[in-house]
C-alpha cells in the first residue's frame, strides 16, 4: 500500500514513493544535456518532477501512464513543490491499489445522481421530462456520468467531478431563478444537466485523466449535441423550437468564442447557464488550490486565472 502521498510531501523531504506518470516530456539544457519533466499523480494531487542526471537511461525504463516507484528530494520552487529525481522504476500493476492514484469527489456518486434525478423529475415540461428519462435509462451513460471527471486540470479534475459540478450547477440554477421572472426553469435545468455531458466521452479516466481521440478531434460540445439530437429524435413530437433552444444552451455555455463556444449566449437562459457554470467552476478551483507554502493565507499562483488568491479564515460555528 502507498504510504506517502503528493499532498503530504514537504520541502527538503527525502521521497521514496509510488506514483502514476501522468505526463513525461524530454528536454535538452543549454549545455546539451538531456532531462525529463514528469507529472506524477496520486489521489491527493500531483507533483512535478525533474530528472537531471541519467535522464536517457532512466527514461527508457518507463512510459506515460505507468505506475512507478520514485526516489528523490523534494524542494519548494516558485511556490510549488518539486522533486529532483534520483531514480524511477516501473512497478507491476499487481502491487498497486488503484484507489491510491486517481483523486475522487468527496461526495458519494450514487447519492449525487439520485439527487440530480429528483430535481429533473420535478420538471413540468413533458418533453424535457421524457428526454431526462431517456438519459436515465441509458445505463452506460449513467455509469460514465457517475465516474467522469469535470475537467483535466482546471476545475473538478477528479473522478465523479463532472457529476459533482453538474449537481452543484443545477442547485445554483434553482436558487437564482427565484430572483427573476420569465425564465424557463425547466429548459435551464435540462441545459445544466446536459451542458457538459459530452465529457463522459471526451475523457478517458481509467488511469490518469486524459483526452480520447474523439475528445481531441471533436470536443465535448460537438459530442453532446450529437448525443442529445439522437435522443430527441427518438421522442415523439418533441418541439422543434425547444430542441433548438436546448442545443443553443449547450453550444453557447462557454460564453465566448475564445473559450470554445461557436455561438455567444443569446437567450436569458443561456446567459444564466454560462454565468453560473463559470462561477461554480472558478469557486471550486480556487477553494482547492494548494497553499503558496505551508500555513500561508495565499494560494499558489494559478496560471489559468493569472493570480494568487487570499483565503479568509472563517470561524467554525
Regions found by a protein language model. Give the residues of each.
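Divalent metal-coordination and catalytic microenvironments
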Residues: 19, 65, 169, 277
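Short, acidic/hydrophobic/Gly-rich beta-strand patch recurrent on exposed beta strands
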Residues: 37-42
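Extended, charge-rich, solvent-exposed interface segments
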Residues: 82-147, 223
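OB-fold single-stranded nucleic acid-binding module
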Residues: 24-34, 45-48, 54-102
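N-terminal intrinsically disordered, cationic/polar leader segments
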Residues: 274, 281, 291-317
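OB-fold nucleic-acid-binding modules
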Residues: 1-15
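A short mid-domain helix/strand-loop element embedded in enzyme catalytic domains
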Residues: 128-172, 194-198
Amino acid at each position: 500500500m502507498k504510504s506517502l502521498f503528493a499532498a503530504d510531501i514537504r520541502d527538503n523531504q527525502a521521497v521514496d514513493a509510488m506514483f502514476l506518470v501522468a505526463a513525461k516530456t524530454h528536454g535538452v539544457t543549454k549545455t546539451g544535456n538531456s532531462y525529463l519533466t514528469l507529472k506524477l499523480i496520486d489521489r491527493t494531487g500531483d507533483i512535478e518532477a525533474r530528472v537531471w542526471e541519467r535522464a536517457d537511461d532512466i527514461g527508457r525504463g518507463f512510459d506515460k501512464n505507468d505506475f512507478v516507484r520514485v526516489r528523490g528530494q523534494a524542494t519548494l520552487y516558485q511556490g510549488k513543490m518539486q522533486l529532483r529525481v534520483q531514480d524511477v522504476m516501473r512497478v507491476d500493476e499487481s502491487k498497486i491499489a488503484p484507489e491510491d492514484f486517481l483523486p475522487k469527489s468527496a461526495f458519494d456518486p450514487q447519492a449525487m445522481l439520485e439527487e440530480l434525478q429528483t430535481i429533473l423529475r420535478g420538471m413540468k415540461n413533458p418533453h424535457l421530462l421524457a428526454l431526462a428519462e431517456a438519459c436515465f435509462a441509458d445505463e452506460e451513460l449513467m455509469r460514465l456520468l457517475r465516474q467522469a471527471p469535470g475537467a483535466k486540470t482546471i476545475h473538478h479534475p477528479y473522478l465523479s467531478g463532472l457529476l459533482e459540478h453538474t449537481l452543484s450547477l443545477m442547485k445554483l440554477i434553482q436558487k437564482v431563478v427565484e430572483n427573476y421572472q420569465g425564465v424557463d426553469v425547466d429548459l435551464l435545468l435540462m441545459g445544466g444537466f446536459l451542458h457538459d455531458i459530452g465529457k463522459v466521452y471526451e475523457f478517458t479516466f481509467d488511469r490518469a485523466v486524459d483526452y480520447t481521440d474523439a475528445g481531441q478531434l471533436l470536443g465535448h460540445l460537438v459530442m453532446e449535441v450529437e448525443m442529445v439530437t439522437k435522443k430527441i429524435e427518438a421522442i415523439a413530437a418533441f418541439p422543434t423550437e425547444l430542441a433548438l433552444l436546448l442545443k443553443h444552451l449547450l453550444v453557447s455555455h462557454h460564453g465566448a468564442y475564445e473559450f470554445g463556444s461557436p455561438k455567444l449566449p443569446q437567450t436569458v437562459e443561456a446567459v444564466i447557464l454560462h454565468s453560473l457554470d463559470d462561477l461554480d467552476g472558478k469557486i471550486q478551483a480556487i477553494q482547492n488550490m494548494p497553499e503558496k507554502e505551508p500555513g500561508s493565507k495565499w494560494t499558489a499562483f494559478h496560471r489559468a486565472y493569472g493570480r494568487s488568491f487570499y483565503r479568509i479564515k472563517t470561524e467554525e460555528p
